[in-house]
């Protein structure tokens, strides 16, 4: 029998996240909303991130066997929904740190894990991590044979790797002071000559390397080897930092190479982004849930000049019903996806497809949910004294970031479906090929 009842530890994780969101995160807006630019708003959230560390929310991004407190990805999804239902500021910085740690968590080097995860399980300070993958010219087709590939390159020189190139959008990558994150996993294309284009006859996946860069690494380089060129001003998520960064002959010790370059490194990156894809669904649910809850309260307390609360009008109720159904189905899909990702009996392609369809569905319908909540409320929802304008700007980002639904996530799912041995129901029933004879 399928059981959706939360375990005691999952209920406790939800309670803890709710308490933090309601007592700490609710105060964040008053601090960052007066700031005039993206970086200043990001920096204004630093005390709240420090509180997140102190409350164990960063340690909760690391699995228990590696010194953290994360029991499962289901626990993580529950936590994220509660945080994003209240305030994305700091919450998105926590998520970005989790993504930044993911390649290290997934690697098979206990020594690297012990060394680089240590600051994040200490419960002290404000350590930031970042997965530096995205580039100014886009990375949706970074593994397409015959394409230019990643423009951030790395070449081996003696006992070091030398990085050259630019990154744009990786959250947390500049750190609090633009002197770098405490840990950045920089995804590069191996090339002996950065000025030469990628060989069109070579599989790009075989040329990938991940190098671990710390603030100490940056400090040990020449000043112009690491530069922040700018910070995008965003319509929503106005407290996140994902600056435009340039590496110029930037030296990294060979011991900071995460794993053997090539398919193994590419696999770590793909797995990290598959896990984050499912968890973005929880973030989207939190934001859409906030819109639904505000619209529901409004509909049950306001008449809009009539004789009864607007919830009594069928058109309003229908919009709220649609929102509720989308939220419930999205949550179940997220829970199924993260459970599938942790099921060792399933093939990777099955896990990947489940994560992709979760990211696509949940983030797309979250946008619809916020818009329908606004329609239920009416013109009042467009006023800034309500949460809807902010929620709309935030929810619009989810289908676009962490691998855009159109350019990347649907294409990943398409490739899985096109496989000759594709089994559409493997994540639910195990191996179960479609009987073509009856079709």
UniProtKB/Swiss-Prot annotation:
E.C. code: 1.7.3.1
Any GO MF annotation of the entry: oxidoreductase activity, acting on the CH-CH group of donors
Pfam families: Acyl-CoA_dh_1 (PF00441), Acyl-CoA_dh_N (PF02771)
Induction: Up-regulated by nitroethane.
Residue sites binding FAD per the record: 131-134, 139-141, 169-171, 304, 313-314, 375-379, 400-404
Gene Ontology biological process: butyrate catabolic process; detoxification; fatty acid beta-oxidation using acyl-CoA dehydrogenase
Residues at the catalytic site: 402 (proton acceptor)
Entry cofactors: FAD
Catalysis: reaction(s): a primary nitroalkane + O2 + H2O = an aldehyde + nitrite + H2O2 + H(+); a secondary nitroalkane + O2 + H2O = a ketone + nitrite + H2O2 + H(+)
Temperature remarks: Optimum temperature is 40 degrees Celsius.
pH dependence of activity: Optimum pH is 8.0.
Control of this protein's activity: Strongly inhibited by mercury chloride and KCN.
Group of enzyme by EC: oxidoreductase
InterPro entries xref list: Acyl-CoA_Oxase/DH_mid-dom_sf, AcylCo_DH-like_C, AcylCo_DH/oxidase_C, AcylCoA_DH/ox_N, AcylCoA_DH/ox_N_sf, AcylCoA_DH/oxidase_NM_dom_sf
Keyword set, alphabetical order: FAD, Flavoprotein, Nucleotide-binding, Oxidoreductase
Function according to Swiss-Prot or TrEMBL: Catalyzes the oxidative denitrification of neutral nitroalkanes, including 3-nitro-2-pentanol, 1-nitropropane, 2-nitropropane, nitroethane and nitrocyclohexane, and may thereby protect the organism against toxic compounds. Has no detectable acyl-CoA dehydrogenase activity.
Family in the record: Belongs to the acyl-CoA dehydrogenase family.
Subunit structure comment from the entry: Homotetramer.
Name the record gives this protein: Nitroalkane oxidase
Lineage of source species: Eukaryota, Fungi, Dikarya, Ascomycota, Pezizomycotina
């Amino acid at each position: 029998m399928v059981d959706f009842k939360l375990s005691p530890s999952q209920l406790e994780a939800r309670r803890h996240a709710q308490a933090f969101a309601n007592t700490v995160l609710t105060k964040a807006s008053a601090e960052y909303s007066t700031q005039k630019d993206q970086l200043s708003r990001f920096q204004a959230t630093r005390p709240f991130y420090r509180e997140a560390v102190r409350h164990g929310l960063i340690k909760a991004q690391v699995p228990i066997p590696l010194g953290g407190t994360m029991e499962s990805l289901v626990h993580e999804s529950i936590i994220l929904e509660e945080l994003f239902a209240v305030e994305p500021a700091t919450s998105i910085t926590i998520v970005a740190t989790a993504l930044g740690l993911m390649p290290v968590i997934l690697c098979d080097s206990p020594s690297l894990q012990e060394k680089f995860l240590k600051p994040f399980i200490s419960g002290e300070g404000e350590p930031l991590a970042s997965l530096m993958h995205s580039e100014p010219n886009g990375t949706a087709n970074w593994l397409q044979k015959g394409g230019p590939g990643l423009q951030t390159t790395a070449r081996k020189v003696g006992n070091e790797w030398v990085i050259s190139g630019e990154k744009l959008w990786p959250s947390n990558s500049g750190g609090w002071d633009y002197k770098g994150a405490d840990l950045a996993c920089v995804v590069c294309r191996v090339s002996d000559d950065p000025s030469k284009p990628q060989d069109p006859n070579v599989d790009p996946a075989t040329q990938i390397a991940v190098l671990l860069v710390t603030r100490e690494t940056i400090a040990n380089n020449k000043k112009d080897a690491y530069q922040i060129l700018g910070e995008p001003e965003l319509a929503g998520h106005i407290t996140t930092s994902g600056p435009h960064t340039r590496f110029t002959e930037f030296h990294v010790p060979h011991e900071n190479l995460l794993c053997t370059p090539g398919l193994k490194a590419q696999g770590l990156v793909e797995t990290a982004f598959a896990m984050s894809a499912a968890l973005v669904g929880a973030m989207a649910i939190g934001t859409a849930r906030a819109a639904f809850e505000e619209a529901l309260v409004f509909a049950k307390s306001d008449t809009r000049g009539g004789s009864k609360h607007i919830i009594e009008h069928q058109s309003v109720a229908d919009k709220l019903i649609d929102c509720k159904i989308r939220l419930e189905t999205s949550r179940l899909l997220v829970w199924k996806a993260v459970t599938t990702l942790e099921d060792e009996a399933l093939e990777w392609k099955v896990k990947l497809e489940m994560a992709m369809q979760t990211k696509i569905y949940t983030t797309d319908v979250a946008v619809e949910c916020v818009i329908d909540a606004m329609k239920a409320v009416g013109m009042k929802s467009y006023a800034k004294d309500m949460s809807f304008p902010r929620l709309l700007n935030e929810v619009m980002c989810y289908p676009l970031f962490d691998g855009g639904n159109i350019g990347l996530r649907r294409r990943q799912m398409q490739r899985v479906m096109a496989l000759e041995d594709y089994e559409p129901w493997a994540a639910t029933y195990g191996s179960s090929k479609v009987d073509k004879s009856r079709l």
